[in-house]
């Protein structure tokens, strides 16, 4: 039986180099699978053709934009998904979807192996391989960039040596990953933490200092799902795309951070995620109005744990599924409208309304006629601090 390797193909340096290498190593055939996740830029037909030019026997392009938005971006919105309270999981949420389609392609096209172009330093190797082992443990996994110690310089030199049709060169050494949820840039001069990002690094966002006129917007939610923008019904994908355009024009969603990778090292990453940041900001504001205090407090911890699970490549793990169920249950009343102003790199919420709101004006107002019984407060304060009062009394007496 001829070996057949199903490769997660991006069209970039690492996976283009992987095609002839995999064919040589296995003595078999390579099937390239590329997903359209709304990354824009290069036409997907060009990507498909490049894989064939690099030696793939088949090259498959799958339009997965709506699936990505509905099944991966939307759960991230509901979970207010931010790793280290900053990173909206741009690459992390795309990997389990790519894994899903690679496994399906392997079953359909007689694949014996699956492969990716990730190095041994990154998180993506974990996300891919844990996913493969969860969904199709019978498939063998090959990671040529990691297992054969390919550095970027070696990969570029090899590509030039055999005239692989790739755009990357020694003058442009960045690793870029992008989809409709955002864009990630790493390596190159960014590896020196003191070097500031240059303007040409950014693609999804305008310079926040340009001084574009403020953009006021109303985002409507139904059970945690963005369903309308300025009163116009939208799908989840359309909501992300529109917010990418409008928030991106205001320079929203730029992030330069040093993150703690799963493999134990720290890595500098530059992200752009205008739509993600704007939608999560609005969703969080809607939750603040509609979710009860103790549930909201607990959910913040669940959201953080959910983000860690996803970042760590555990999308298909039992804990992640259980966290999904909890988060989904909290979204029942997350319905209403959020108005916010986007300007100079910031989203500022300035209006909230919901038929499910827990905000009671008569209780909250300080004007005459409020219904809050302040006579209850004195006893509440005494009881609230009673245990710490007793503990401190004991400690003073013991001194």
Curated annotation (Swiss-Prot):
GO terms for cellular component: cytoplasm. The keyword DNA repair does not apply. L-citrulline binds at residues 87, 123, 127, 175, 259, 271. Keywords: Amino-acid biosynthesis, Arginine biosynthesis, ATP-binding, Cytoplasm, Ligase, Nucleotide-binding. Pathway: Amino-acid biosynthesis; L-arginine biosynthesis; L-arginine from L-ornithine and carbamoyl phosphate: step 2/3. L-aspartate binds at residues 119, 123-124. Pfam families: Arginosuc_syn_C, Arginosuc_synth. Its EC number is 6.3.4.5. It is found in: Cytoplasm. Its main location: cytoplasm. CDD domains: ASS (cd01999). Belongs to the argininosuccinate synthase family. Type 1 subfamily. Homotetramer. This is Argininosuccinate synthase. The lineage of its organism: Bacteria, Bacillati, Actinomycetota, Actinomycetes, Mycobacteriales. The gene is argG.
């Amino acid at each position: 039986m001829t070996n057949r390797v199903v490769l997660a193909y991006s069209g970039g340096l690492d996976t283009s180099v992987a095609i002839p290498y995999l064919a040589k190593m296995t003595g078999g055939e390579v099937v390239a699978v590329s997903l359209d996740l709304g990354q824009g830029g290069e036409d997907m037909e060009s990507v498909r053709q490049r894989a064939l030019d690099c030696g793939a026997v088949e090259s498959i392009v799958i339009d997965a934009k709506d699936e990505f938005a509905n099944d991966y971006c939307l759960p991230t919105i509901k979970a207010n998904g931010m790793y280290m309270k900053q990173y909206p999981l741009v690459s992390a949420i795309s990997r389990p979807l790519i894994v899903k389609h690679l496994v399906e392609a392997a079953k359909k096209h007689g694949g014996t192996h699956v492969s990716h172009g990730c190095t041994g330093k990154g998180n993506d190797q974990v996300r891919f391989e844990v996913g493969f082992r969860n969904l199709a443990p019978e498939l063998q996994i090959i990671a040529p960039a990691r297992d054969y110690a390919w550095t970027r310089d070696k990969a570029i030199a090899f590509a030039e040596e055999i005239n692989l049709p790739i755009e990357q060169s020694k003058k442009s050494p960045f690793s870029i990953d992008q989809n409709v949820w955002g864009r990630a840039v790493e390596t190159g001069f960014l590896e020196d933490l003191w070097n500031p990002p240059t303007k040409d690094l950014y693609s999804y966002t305008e310079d926040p200092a340009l001084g574009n006129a403020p953009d006021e917007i109303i985002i409507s939610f139904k059970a945690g799902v963005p369903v309308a923008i300025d009163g116009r019904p939208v799908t989840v994908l359309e909501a992300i795309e529109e917010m990418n355009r409008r928030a991106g024009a205001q320079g929203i969603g730029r992030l330069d951070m040093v993150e703690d990778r799963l493999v134990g090292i720290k890595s500098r990453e530059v992200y752009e995620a205008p739509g993600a940041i704007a939608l999560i900001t609005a969703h969080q504001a809607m939750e603040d109005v509609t979710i009860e205090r103790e549930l909201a407090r607990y959910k913040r911890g669940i959201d953080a744990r959910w983000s860690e699970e996803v970042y760590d490549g555990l999308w298909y793990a039992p804990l992640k599924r259980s966290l999904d169920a909890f988060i989904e249950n909290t979204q029942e009343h997350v319905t209403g409208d959020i108005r916010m102003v986007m300007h100079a790199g910031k989203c500022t919420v300035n209006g909230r309304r919901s038929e499910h709101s827990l905000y009671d004006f008569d209780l909250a107002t300080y004007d005459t006629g409020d219904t809050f019984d302040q006579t209850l407060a004195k006893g509440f304060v005494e009881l609230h601090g009673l245990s710490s009062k007793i503990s401190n009394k004991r400690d003073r007496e013991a001194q």
